[in-house]
């Protein structure tokens, strides 16, 4: 609510499958956090993450990701997610922009291509696919935090991460 100045978020946010505790456990053990935008990476508190030996990263601008996405005719968000999700040290996923990243992660989990994440913050914003991607992810039974409907965004994803870190850092 503080990040958006929108009180409706109190009714839209949803926490599933012990998301907070699962996220805290992954952070305590030091993990990588994949972000679908560099804006999330830049917003995440590197100082606090370093206290837990955690690192936030994004691959959408990676030259190999750009090349592969072009060759396959898909978005960089899809290819970035494919690569990040296969890294066994990536336990948390913050998705604030690209519904395609959330769909890709869901498909990989359903096909048992990857270990189930410790936490997914799925809050892509927008009119095309955002609400649907967030809704379909709920069926997986994994620790998940979302904002129902079209609202969300990179700043919301960062604020959710910071909320969890704040609880741990007190």
Over which residues does each language-model region extend?
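Generic secondary-structure signature for well-ordered alpha-helical cores
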Residues: 5-9, 25-32, 49-50, 86-89, ...
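Conserved mixed alpha/beta catalytic, RNA-binding, or beta-rich assembly cores of soluble enzyme
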Residues: 37-111, 118, 126, 134
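C-terminal functional extensions of proteins
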Residues: 128-170
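Short, basic, glycine/proline-bearing loop/turn elements
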Residues: 2-11, 66-68, 119
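A short, well-structured juxtamembrane/interface segment
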Residues: 11-26
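Short, glycine/acidic-enriched capping/hinge loops at junctions between secondary-structure elements
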Residues: 11-12, 43-47, 157
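Buried hydrophobic positions in well-ordered alpha/beta secondary-structure cores of metabolic enzymes
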Residues: 36, 120-122, 160
